[in-house]
Amino acid sequence: MSGSSKVRRPATLASLAAELGVSRTTVSNAYNRPDQLSAPLRERVLEAARRLGYPGPDPVARSLRTRRAGAVGLLLTEALSYAFRDPVATGFLEGLALACEAAGQGLLLVPVSPEHVDVSAVYRAGVDGFVVYSVREDDPHFLAVLKRPVPTVVCDQPAGVEGVDRVGVDDRKAMLGLARHLTGLGHRRVGVICMRLAAQRHDGRVSAARQTEIAYPVQRNRLAGLRDGLAEVGVDWAGVPIWERFDHSVEAGESAAAELLAAHPELTAVVCTSDILALGALRHATDRGLRVPEDLTITGFDGVPEAERAGLTTVWQPVLEKGRAAGELLLERGDRSRPRWITLPTELRVGHTSCAPRDAQRWFSGL
């Protein structure tokens, strides 16, 4: 067409090398092995690339040649939005991203529903290794990760997988400390709101049989820590009501608290296995006209910013450092044959949502 301008194709590695009068290896080294070139020569190559529109080496071709993808995969058995909505997941993701960024690696999220059994996303992921974020022991996606010939690091759960590095906290010990705080205040009539315990969707009271089939070690260990602490003061675990929520949200905690307290109005304390659930329980208590902590003590676990603002008594854990440690462990593994297990510290943070029950003196006197 008359008067139309021609669209110039971007330069290629070969055309850029010809333009500069250097070898194609020299151009490639400017991107992939900069230490092989003098600083002036590398800058000359990069300046010409910018001027001629050369985008750099094709990452697909490079990965085929080097057999490295330059990316870490994060297996998340939740919807993708969960990673940006849940504050614990967000903090972990930030820490992992910082580790990848420092190492010049990309980060690929591999989100799959906990009720989804198709593992093809795991096999399609072009990554050099996986960080597995808190999945159940028999999760098919985790089993698919283990079949891939790449290093793997687990965050939180499952624990004790042969040959696999792990980063986590001692959930049982942490919850034992919280339980002792409550029993020290005089609480004996305690109820629990917990996160998902198994793959099968369930919302409501947790039976004794379901407690023996818990597939998520973190929840199993947090409940065990509470059981240990209550046993120290003679509380029969069989009499402790536990309410489960499959979905993890403030709304889930709110509805669980409504059901739990309707069934057991005698409770003086509600222990939630996450801050998110505890914030929901706080909302319900307020709507019900209960004073927290005078009428009802409520506690959480995680130490998320919103819980801190609410003055929640909780167990704080270093979620950002978890992510950073998991990333560094994966990226620094090298030829190390023995797995490393890193246990990070937790801290009991007593806020404004726990105090002695009004009838504490009666319990202490044994009446």
Model-identified regions with their sequence ranges:
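Alpha-helical recognition/docking segments in bacterial nutrient-uptake
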Residues: 1-11, 26, 71-184, 367
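N-terminal helix-turn-helix DNA-binding module of bacterial transcription factors
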Residues: 1-68, 366-367
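Flexible loop/turn connectors
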Residues: 13, 254, 258-367
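Short beta-strand scaffold positions
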Residues: 17, 132, 272-273
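Non-catalytic positions within long, well-ordered alpha-helices that form the structural scaffold/packing
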Residues: 18, 65, 123, 183-186
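Short acidic/polar active-site loop segments enriched in Thr and Asp
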Residues: 23, 70, 128, 187-189, ...
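Hinge/beta->alpha junction and helix N-cap segments in small-molecule ligand-binding domains
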Residues: 78-91, 112-117, 167-177, 192-231, ...
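Short acidic capping loops at alpha-helix termini that bridge into adjacent secondary structure
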Residues: 188-189, 237-240, 291-297
